[in-house]
Each structure stands twice: as C-alpha cells, then as structure tokens.
A protein has these predicted regions:
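A well-structured
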Residues: 1-252
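Extended non-transmembrane interhelical loops and adjacent amphipathic helices
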Residues: 136-140, 262, 296-300, 304
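Glycine-rich, acidic/polar active-site loops that bind/position phosphate-bearing ligands
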Residues: 166, 174, 211-218, 259, ...
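Active-site recognition of the HExxH zinc-binding catalytic motif
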Residues: 191, 320-341
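Short alpha-helical functional segments enriched in proximate histidine and acidic residues
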Residues: 220, 224-227, 269, 336, ...
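Long, K/E/R/D-enriched contiguous segments that form extended
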Residues: 230, 234-278, 282, 304, ...
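Catalytic zinc-binding patch centered on the HExxH motif and its immediate surroundings
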Residues: 252-257, 290-311
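Short pre-active-site segment immediately N-terminal to the catalytic Zn-binding motif
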Residues: 253-259, 308-330
Length: 341
C-alpha cells in the first residue's frame, strides 16, 4: 500500500459514503414526518438494507488500515497529499483495539437492519401512533400543556401523558431493555473498559474530560435545587410537582406566538449576535428547510438533521406556538447553522 493508492481508496469510500448518506437522509426524513405510511417505512427499510450490504463489502478498509504497523501508518499519514483525509484516518485508528475479526465485523454489518435501527424504527412508529386523552391528541399537543399558566391544564396534560405511556409500558420497556442489552453485548465483545468509552471515542474525547464534566455538574446540584425552590415561591404553591417544572413565572409574557412572530424573534436574536449567522438561519425559512406543523404520525420532539457537505441540513420541530417552541426552534437553528457551515 502506497500513499497514492491509499488516497484513491479513501476517495472512493468518500464518494460511496456521501451517496449513501444522501439516500439515508431522504428516506429517514420522508419517514419521520409520516411514521404510519407503509411506503415511507418500506423505503427506509430498503435503504437500511442497502447500507448494510455496502457496509459488509467495505468494512475491510477500516480493518486493514487499523492492522497496519503504526510506523507505516504514520509514514503514510505524513505525506503532504494525505492532508485531506489525515484526521479521518487517524480517528479510525483509535478504534483498532476494539475491532473484531473480519468475519465477525461483516456479520455485524449484515445484521444492522434487524438490530438497533429496527428497534428505533419500532419506537418511532409507536410514538407516531400514540394518542392521549379523550380528545386523542398527539404527544406534542399534550406536552404543550405542561407550559400552560393554568395549573389544572398542566396537571391534565401530565395525567394524559402518563396514562398513554402506561398503556404501552410493556412494549416501551422491552424496546429500552433490548437496546441496552445490545449495547452491553457490543461493549463486551469489543472490550470497552466502560459503557461510555465507545461514545467518547466517537466524539474524540478523553474519558477523564467527560468524567470531569459530570463530576463538576453533579457537585453543583444545589443550583437546580435553589432554582426550583425559588420557582415554587414565585408560583405560590405549597408543593412543586413534575407538571410545574415548565410553568411560566407570573408576570412573564404569555399568549400564542405566530410562526411569523417566531421567525422575527429568532432571527433578531441571531442578528444581535452575528449578522452572518442570521443570514444563514434565514435561508432555512426562505428555502423551506424547516418542517414545523404538528401532524398525525409525525415524530415528536425536534432535531437538526445534517446530510453531506454538498447538501443543506433540515430541521424538524413540532410548533404549537408557545415560548418553549420559539426557544426550541432557535436551539435547532443553531445546530442547523453549524451544520451548514
């Protein structure tokens, strides 16, 4: 293996990965807004099966690269023409102690469509179908009640959410336990020293960095305690319950925020920080890169979904018009701007 051959192989892999990433992004986003649609679900499954086949046929590259003698690998990485892929190749070698045999890695790639992704798909389908309360509301519509100034409305929303989840507790618990068990088995087979090591490697973080952060946050739990004690006083309640956590503080702004008002609030805030950031964020509105309405079958929550460097990201929110939704959109747009850059 010489430097030129390595460059060609990584370039070919990049081309395949980018094409596959586009297909996966389209299939996932097409499905996630209509989880009950059979055709959308079938398309996502087909793309995941294709990704598994491609993964099985290309997994050899990472395995062989990681088996290369360290001195030889560093020599190849030191070539000036390798600069484009140097970081990618160095990051791959961090996983060398945890890779399995070629046959085992190929088998795991083959099983991908019926492993973690299948359970995640089942979870998304389940939540896309869940309805809460006598009015049959969606998850996002019920969660919106938790931000209502009327405590009775918040309590009703919490009760409806709990009741709806309890009816599906057996299935949700099974999904959660299965995913946890798969993670445990994978960590054991790959000889990770702790449950978080694989994630830290993927994030290119040292364990001690994450442990320091966790310790620092845990050591100041008193900040959260003081916050909720003060909120209890401001709300004037004898005891603070879970459905009071997001209650608006008396005297603050209330009422519905239209989509146009939301857009103005978010872009104005971004512009005060960086006009360039606001200009990029505005493209998400103008070019319709945001999916905002609450729809039956649409997944709850919010996210910014990247694609490839040559394609723009997308944002999903479930906009119900409260201040929480405005903050959520601003948060996701921050990710979106980052991904676009």
């Amino acid at each position: 293996l010489n430097a030129a051959a390595l460059h060609r192989q990584v370039g070919d892999r990049e081309e395949v990965d980018c094409l596959l990433a586009r297909l996966e992004a389209f299939a996932f986003l097409h499905f996630i807004t209509q989880t009950g649609d059979a055709a959308a679900s079938a398309l996502l499954q087909q793309v995941e099966e294709l990704a598994a086949r491609v993964g099985r046929q290309t997994v050899f590259f990472a395995l062989e690269w990681n088996r290369l003698d360290p001195a030889r690998a560093e020599h190849l990485l030191g070539q000036p023409e390798r600069e484009r892929y140097r970081h990618y190749l160095r990051a791959l070698r961090q996983f060398a102690p945890h890779q399995l045999s070629s046959a085992e890695e190929e088998l795991l790639q083959e099983l991908r469509p019926v492993g973690r992704s299948a359970w995640n798909l089942l979870f998304d389908k389940l939540f896309g179908h869940l309805r809460f309360g006598v009015d049959g509301r969606t998850e996002e519509e019920v969660l919106s009640d938790l931000h209502h100034p009327d405590r009775a409305v918040r309590r009703r929303g919490a009760d409806e959410l709990t009741a709806g989840l309890r009816e599906n507790l057996h299935l949700l618990t099974h999904i959660f336990n299965t995913l946890a068990a798969e993670k445990m088995i994978d960590d054991r087979l790959r000889r990770y020293p702790s449950w978080i090591r694989a994630r830290n490697l993927a994030n290119e973080l040292e364990d001690r960095t994450v442990e320091t952060l966790v310790a620092a946050v845990t050591a100041r739990n008193d900040i959260a305690h003081r916050y909720y004690a003060r909120k209890q006083q401001l709300l004037g309640v004898d005891e603070l319950f879970d459905y009071d956590r997001y209650a608006p503080v008396p005297g603050g702004e209330e009422g519905q925020v239209t989509w146009d008002q939301c857009r103005e609030i978010v872009l104005s805030a971004f512009a005060a920080f960086s006009p360039e950031m606001a200009a990029i964020a505005e493209r998400f509105f103008v070019e319709r890169w945001i999916h905002a309405p609450v729809l039956p079958g649409k997944r709850g929550g919010a996210f910014a979904h990247p694609c490839v460097p040559e394609a723009h990201p997308y944002i999903l929110v479930n906009y119900t018009g409260n201040l929480r939704d405005v903050a959520t959109l601003a948060h996701e747009l921050g990710h979106g701007v980052h991904q676009q850059l």
